[in-house]
Amino acid sequence: MAKVVVLGGCGAVGSVAVETLAGQDIISEVVVADHAEEKARQLAGRIASPKVSAAFVDAFEPETIRRAIRGAEVVLNCIGPFYSTVKPILTAVVDAGINYVDICDDVDVTLEILDMDDQARARGVTALIGMGSSPGATNLLARLAYDTLLDETDAVDIFHTHGGEAIEGEGVIAHRFHCMSIDIPMYLDGKLTAVKYFEPDGVALRQTFDFPMIGRDIPIYPYPHPEQVTLPRYLRLRQVTNKGSVLPNEYYDLIRDLCGLGLARTEPIDVKGLQVVPHDFAVAYVLRERERILRKTGFTRPCGCCSVIARGMKNGLPREYRFHMASRSQALGEGTGIPAAVGVMLMAMGKIRGTGVMPPEACVEPMDFVNLISRVMKLDARKDDGESFGGVILQMVDEQGVVTKLDI
């Protein structure tokens, strides 16, 4: 049995991970560590399990991190935005010699923490990074197709959408602005390249996609997630892309338009004698408008889907496999928090291979993940009369375009 500390345990993702872990026999203790300590206590009180307690942590105060993680077997880091928080947290955890899981989805800092591999190995630490939905589940489903379904895999395309969460924090909005502002890596024609969200090369990659259980012709946009960088390191591929969106479309459009107008900038401007940071205003404005947009569009409950499309050859013929993880009543919190909790559980079971800083495809057996997450999410679905989770849906598309649903 393992003691787990969940950093950022009060957030949309962290709180789901806390609740999931608290219900697992293999987990002996869960500490909800958050800057909002009172909210952490309230969450622990709602769960009402002797396993769950609360603690204070500040991602930018190393001593508070060290205090919060003391005595843990595994630390799960859910504190965003990761481009500013993950390095000091991972440094503190590695220095303490504790195994680590996170849901980091910022590609730029992912490259930086992968460079901490030698440091983690020297301390005997296993650090599983990007263990959410995308990245996370996507990496493992891509690996599953590559290892077991296709003789040759040419391309992996990752598509995702979600929306309607009960809460969204400032870090989530900041992450979206960040995603639209930085170079977006895409692995095309066997080479890593970069496109820009608002420039013609990025606009050319926009498309629509039919997400099972969610809707048809959902617009999706280039996303700077880590899969495009990490998957080609471990799998011989010619293409890896990542595209996504947030629902409803009107809400995503607001975020996109504010960013396009320059309101994601962090340099203060003078407004009638007051120094105002456009980014801070835009985040606050988005969070205020979100409730109005959800009401206006009739978006009354969360939903989400993450799809992995693997294309290549099987028995000398073109073949495509499509994995979908879809839900009509779960979204970012569950879609990311439950895979993260499963990553922690696999760590506690001793099923994560090796030491160092590694993405999922480097150290997790895909079927270990698929079997465990299917069990956990189906149990969670009972909260919503069985509507919550559609399971891991697998489809095959043959050379004639005929789609067949398969069992995993």
Residue ranges of each PLM-predicted region?
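ADP-ribose/adenylate-binding Rossmann-like module
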Residues: 81, 92-110
